[in-house]
Amino acid sequence: MTSTRQFHMNDLFRFNNVNLDVLTETYNMPFYLQYMSKWPELFTVAEAPNNSIMGYMLGKSEGSDTLWHGHVSAVTVAPLYRRLGLAKTLMEDLENTSSNVYNAYFVDLFVRASNTLAISMYEKFGYVKFRRVLGYYAGDDPEDAWDMRKALRRDENKQSIIPMDRPVHPYELEW
């Protein structure tokens, strides 16, 4: 049976089966350490009965006033464990913690505009395309992103998910 728990320091040496995948964004060690120290409740792993890491969620809280929200920095599942509902479980954990612990209005995430599989998955989880962010992903292959959102209990009127009527540039993003 799969269990979820907070990410621990030693997991940094155990999650290569998840991280070394072309679909997974990877970060440097200080990035992961920052999340562990600032938002430990939003940095979780799914663990198999044999103690191998099946996937993880890297999240944080940010914003102010009605823009106070949970943010999905990364959610990824090892290829061997995909299509078992683990991403949904990890997302629900982050949503519940964002709502119950951080009292957030919504959860958001950014996804490559070309990643139709992920976009479809997030839409099945109740996320909507809030706005297109032009040139969000820089580098050798620059690409737009979708800022996708899901309203939480605190946003009774669902104001946080009313789609914008125009694309924005990264410098226009506000929290």
Where are the predicted features?
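Conserved catalytic-core motifs of GNAT/GCN5-like acyltransferases
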Residues: D108-F110, E123-D147, L173
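Conserved GNAT acetyl-CoA-binding A-motif
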Residues: S98-F110, M121
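Loop/turn elements at beta-strand to alpha-helix junctions within RNA-recognition modules
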Residues: A78, R112-N115
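Short acidic/glycine-enriched loop/turn segments that link adjacent beta-strands
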Residues: W39, T66, N115, G139-E143
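Conserved G/P- and acidic residue-centered "switch" motifs that form tight phosphate/ATP-binding loops
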Residues: G85
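Acetyl-CoA-dependent GNAT
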Residues: T2, M9-R82, M91-Y102, A151-D155, ...
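Short glycine/proline-centered loop/turn elements that form peptide/ligand docking sites
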Residues: M91, N115-A118, G135-D140
